[in-house]
């Protein structure tokens, strides 16, 4: 039995919570992980948008925060090495998976329901992608780790998230 050993009532009571609210688009949740794919069909409507960068000039830091074209967040790994901030996809999509748990759009007939994904009317929490991990093939003789990130990347991500309105940071980190 898949439920053997599970404590009765140990769920999150999502149904009861959704009777009060299913999300709030004024709340920004930073996903500090690998990339959150901003075009994912179950996440796109709930992605945080840096309006100054979205409507600004490509290749320019339109909002003056030190990061160029950070429309949905920043790739802190790339920034550390080459100064660019473009979000890049990974093989595992862990950040996208985590973001779906938080705020996949509810009631849209796609995928699953996020805990704070809203009612399907654009009222879910906003997801900010703070990419702090990247994937290095295990065959790489220098690193032999997967995924990889640095304390510097994480610290920059927390600072960026706080400076740009995130009230919550999700850090689904671990190691073997």
Roles of regions detected by a PLM:
Residues 158-176:
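Short acidic, glycine-rich surface-loop motifs adjacent to enzyme active sites
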